[in-house]
Amino acid sequence: MRFRHHVALATLIFSSLVASMAMAGVPVQWSVDVHAPIYNPPRVADGVVYFDTAQSKGPNVFSAKNGKILWRFMTGGTVLMPLTVGHGQVWVASDVGSTHYLRAIEAKTGKLIWDYTRHEPPECMCSHLTHYEHHLLFAQTDGHSLYAFYPVGNIPNRRLWAFTGDGAKLTAPVVVDHTVIFGSADHSIYGLFDKTGKIRWQQKTGYGFMAQPAVWKHEVIIGNRGGIVHAYSTTTGTTLWNFTTNGPINTTALIWHDSAFIASGAGDRGVYALSAKTGKQLWYTRMADYTAYAPVMAKQILVVASQDGNILGLSAKTGKILWRSELHGIPKSQPVLWKGDAVLKVNDHKIMAFNAQSGGLVWTYHSKNVVTSPVPKDDSVYVGTSGGTLVAIGQ
């Protein structure tokens, strides 16, 4: 199926701050009605907001400053995951029936640079899309395959290599020391040579992995569904240390200085601080309920959202609870930092911001529709809604 490139959107309505007075106390800078649901979080880079809608089926590109449209690209299919931006390109994965596309679009103009097409049964082509400094693009497909692409340059063979597992779902990869590292539901963690995709090392454990690995120096740290935290050499896969918790680990470790902070799941309901070098426990703080999202660090305060409807600030050095604030709902996203505040999605219709040092509520954005996870960038926090509104919140 061919696609169309639109430069203008005739039905676009720009809503001013005055039209948003129903959200009293929320510093809305601008909002744009695009008349189509926005389900994936937007991406923001170089003063531009990129997002897709259920009807546009491709990138919509707006000025981050004032919400005016810059260009629009129609893929002709269903967008499968949030857009990825880098190296002056926008990457979008989409499908039409049994045909799967991965396209690179010029970020400034909306011009198609290249596309990769694949034909097979209609299932999710892409669940993770990432890039790194060596200009390789990795797309995880079908839940068990990993592809590498050259995203830049005029070359005839865009795809570099492909890794296919045994059908088990893979985590998002990290790239360090020329090694592509990821966990798998087949109970293994893999390290691949980044230029060839061949297995550099593989470690088998007793449980599957769900979360992306974290990196500390030349060490990769990852927890599994059995509650065990593993640390491996990035180049050899040698086991450096193991630490056992009492609950499944479904989130990525937070690395801060020489410490790794681990959120343990149901059955444990706590946060561990471990030495990244030795795996020694530094402290453990039990909470009223587990956290489904990784914590974030704000000036030596660890901010954690708990499934019991609270957000907490812990001392990074001791684990002591410094503050606790009610969400009046269930957290639906990892907290993100913006101008000293911890911002997160609560339930399906609310974005809340708390002072990361004191826990005080700063503002709450309410929507009649389901909102995306918040995306902070520079002077604004960007949110899309299922009602077709893109909102920029800022001071």
Annotated model-derived regions:
Residues 1-6, 395:
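Positively charged n-region of N-terminal signal peptides that target proteins for export
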Residues 8-20:
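Bacterial N-terminal signal peptides
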Residues 20-22, 269:
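Residue-level detector of intrinsically disordered terminal segments
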Residues 25-39, 50, 57-58, 68-75, ...:
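Aromatic (tryptophan-biased) beta-strands that constitute blades/sheets of beta-rich domains
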Residues 35-59, 77-103, 120-147, 163-190, ...:
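Repeat-blade elements of multi-bladed beta-propeller folds
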Residues 63-66, 106-109, 150-155, 193-197, ...:
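Short loop/turn segments that connect beta-strands within beta-propeller blades
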